Design a protein with these regions (language model features):
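PLP-dependent enzyme catalytic core of the Aspartate aminotransferase-like
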Residues: 198-200, 259-283
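Active-site PLP attachment segment
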Residues: 139-171, 182-189
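A short glycine-threonine-serine/GTX helix/turn-capping micro-motif
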Residues: 77, 172-183
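Conserved PLP phosphate-binding loop immediately N-terminal to the Schiff-base lysine helix
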Residues: 91-104, 117-139, 145
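PLP-dependent aspartate aminotransferase-fold enzymes
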Residues: 1-86
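Active-site core of PLP-dependent enzymes with the aminotransferase class I/II
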Residues: 72-78, 94-115
Length: 283
């Protein structure tokens, strides 16, 4: 996934002849992405993890990556609208802990088009959950490029990039390569998965399982007199136990994972719905 977002950014820079990139979400571990923390170690706090150290990333990349916050209309006006003309691309996840606001995406689409800025949707996590494709189809906002990852092959390593021909053809003008591009297991698994996804209407099944997981969490919290907050699209649900001190959460979730392991269950604060989760297993 990280390699494919890097390819998308490379093509956007080749196409626009600009260098700066706006980001909103988690797009991998590569230098181009982590470079945003050179100027401010807190830049990725709301996108990945707090306090990530960009040690080893060339300082020459300082100020080449501009972050903005998900569904934040103030950032939309003060950052995206003001600086899009400097940027080769806006790359973002159309679903993070929740679906992007459609008006937020529509405005970003307009800004990108107006400023010769490639709009990239990172669908590595969000695709194939609600539907047999990217979640941008559900939202009705089309990017210029979109990236997909191993979900499309049921977990077998694979990544894909789709997009407008005029941008994709920049691959002829730059250098992109991979040792594993001639490997065929991933594509074969992807074809089989997509066919089965369509046949089973798997998106609907995953949504129903996600709702059941949420119902179980809600009831368990009520039974234990706990206040929880549930986020995410249904197939990618997560929870957080709310306390007076927000710094308690890392301790709470560590304890939760520890106690679940004692029950021989590998669990955290999020659950990715899958076809094999029976009602009995979820209960």
């Amino acid at each position: 996934g990280g390699e494919m977002t890097t390819v998308a950014v490379r093509l956007a820079r080749a196409y626009t002849k600009k260098e700066k990139i706006m980001i909103c979400g988690y797009h991998g571990w590569h230098d181009w992405y982590l470079a945003t923390n050179i100027s401010n170690h807190n830049n990725l706090d709301n996108h990945l993890l707090p306090g990530l150290n960009p040690l080893g990333v060339p300082k020459a990349l300082r100020d080449t990556i501009i972050p903005f916050n998900f569904n934040n209309f103030e950032d939309l006006i003060n950052i995206v609208k003001e600086r899009a003309n400097e940027c080769a691309a806006i790359i973002m996840e159309p679903a993070r802990n929740s679906l992007a606001d459609k008006s937020f995406l529509n405005e970003i689409r307009k800004i990108a088009s107006k400023n010769n800025c490639v709009l990239i949707f990172d669908e590595i996590t969000s695709a194939w959950r609600n539907d047999t494709s990217g979640i941008h189809k559900e939202l009705g906002v089309n990017p210029d490029l979109a990236t997909f990852g191993k979900t499309m092959a049921n977990g077998i390593p694979i990544a894909a990039l789709i997009g407008k021909k005029k941008i994709m053809e920049q691959v002829k003008n730059t250098f992109i390569s991979s040792t594993n591009w001639t490997e065929r297991l991933g594509p074969a698994c992807a074809v089989a998965f997509i066919k089965k996804h369509k046949r089973l209407n798997l998106g609907k099944i995953l949504q129903n399982k996600g709702k059941k997981i949420r119902d179980i969490w809600t009831q368990s919290a009520e039974d234990s007199n706990l206040k929880i907050k549930i986020d995410g699209i249904l197939p990618l649900s997560s929870f957080k136990i709310e306390t007076q001190n927000k710094d308690d959460w890392p301790i709470i979730i560590t304890y939760f994972i520890q106690e679940m392991l004692k029950k021989k269950i590998l669990a955290s604060d999020r659950c990715y719905s899958n076809y094999c989760q029976s009602d009995g297993l979820l209960d």
